[in-house]
From Swiss-Prot:
One of its GO terms (cellular component) is cytosolic large ribosomal subunit. InterPro entries: Ribosomal_uL22, Ribosomal_uL22_bac/chlpt-type, Ribosomal_uL22_bac/org-type, Ribosomal_uL22_CS, Ribosomal_uL22_sf. Pfam families: Ribosomal_L22. This is Large ribosomal subunit protein uL22. PROSITE patterns: RIBOSOMAL_L22 (PS00464). Keywords: Ribonucleoprotein, Ribosomal protein, RNA-binding, rRNA-binding. GO terms for molecular function: rRNA binding; structural constituent of ribosome.
């Protein structure tokens, strides 16, 4: 039995999100939450919420035992990039790119 949780449009680059996702892939959910709680990265807080949501989904929808759950798959994909403009000297302008990503978590026994 596998249960999913998805978070779309997170204001985080996919590259930075993947660094955090690699830390918890394949771990038990208890161990994964512990790693994410003490990680100083911005992506850790975001991914922790998605893992907690997947755990809640497994408990509520499937009646799963929380202690037996593991993070089966976790991956981060690129989302749309927000394009912004900032004024520069001599009437010029530069683009500012604000990347987003989608986080997918699957937990199971």
């Amino acid at each position: 039995m596998e249960t999913k949780a998805i978070l779309r449009g997170v204001r985080l680059s996919a590259q930075k999100g993947r660094l955090v996702a690699d830390l918890v892939r394949g771990k038990s959910v208890d161990q994964a939450l512990n790693i994410l709680a003490f990680s100083p990265k911005k992506g850790a807080k975001i991914i922790r919420k998605v893992v907690e949501s997947a755990i809640a989904n497994a408990e509520h929808n499937d009646g799963a035992d929380i202690d037996a759950l593991k993070v089966k798959t976790i991956y981060v994909e690129e989302g749309t990039t927000l394009k912004r403009f900032t004024a520069r000297a001599k009437g010029r302008g530069n683009r500012i790119l604000k990347p987003t990503c989608h986080v997918f978590v699957t937990v199971g026994e």
